Amino acid sequence: MGTIVLKMTAEQISVLQKDLASYATATKNPYAFFSAKVDGTSVIAYTSGKVTFQGAKPEILASRFGYQAEPKQSPDGQNLALIGSDEVGNGSYFGGLAVVASLVTPADHAFLKSLGVDDSKNLNDSKIRQIAPLLEEKIPHKALLLSPRKYNEVVGDGKAHNAVSVKVALHNQAIFLLLQSGAKPDKIVIDAFISEKNYQKYLKNERNHFEFPITLEEKAEGKYLAVAVSSIIARNLFLENLDKLSQEVGYTLPSGAGAKSDQVAAKLLQAYGDQALQTTAKYHFANTKKAYQRLK
């Protein structure tokens, strides 16, 4: 899924509207006044004068309205101010869900590479704890942590969110807050965890919206420094929360959702009852049922 953004005059947009009138579609975006879909490419014209083309090959349609392809950028977003967003904790039974959006400019690249910034999955926790504070101090970002207690209040059958829609909400809010703080990116990338269609479906339920298009890209943390920064800061935030929860219950809470998590969950049930899992774990995970089975 590619995205192209053009800044167009009122006259140019008027021409676009006439040319694409037969392809017009309805839009609920409060910042948009025209949308269309042509051969798999979605077009949205915003009141700001920006027009986005999004699809598998958006350059084909965009070239009809003044777009000229630029030399290919390097994967880390060379010459681009990039907002990258990533989450950590969604696959772990214990601990909260951390989402971070970060703004990285070309001027930051040398600093980030000097720290060895890379996909946090390739860094051990000790290294992450070491460099995350440096990133937090240097790089503009917004970090959100949904604690297990709050997670269990909003995620589950009959509740406001499922395990996917809650991530859409958090990514959207983190990016929204970063933009509100004055960040001016050339591109916004989220490490893909959902299809573009379903992301937009869940996004309709959110209160806060912004007109800048987002790109969902698989394994983005290994391609873009901004996403890697967010991944590292989010991992550190998740680890700090796991440490805090471990201290509160007197047990070392493991990361992940394997047999070790089942064992510790069973111990918590035995020591404190069901409420301990409500405040330390993502209760809807299968680990909860397995922990109860261990007590039989």
Curated annotation (Swiss-Prot):
Keyword Metal-binding attached: yes
GO MF annotation, one: RNA-DNA hybrid ribonuclease activity
Domain RNase H type-2: 80-296
Record-linked PROSITE patterns: RNASE_H_2 (PS51975)
Cell compartment(s), UniProt: Cytoplasm
Main location: cytoplasm
Organism this protein belongs to: Streptococcus thermophilus (strain ATCC BAA-491 / LMD-9)
Gene (name only): rnhC
Cofactor binding notes: Manganese or magnesium. Binds 1 divalent metal ion per monomer in the absence of substrate. May bind a second metal ion after substrate binding.
Residues the record lists as binding a divalent metal cation: D86, E87, D191
Reaction catalyzed: Endonucleolytic cleavage to 5'-phosphomonoester
Protein name from the UniProt record: Ribonuclease HIII
Known EC number: 3.1.26.4
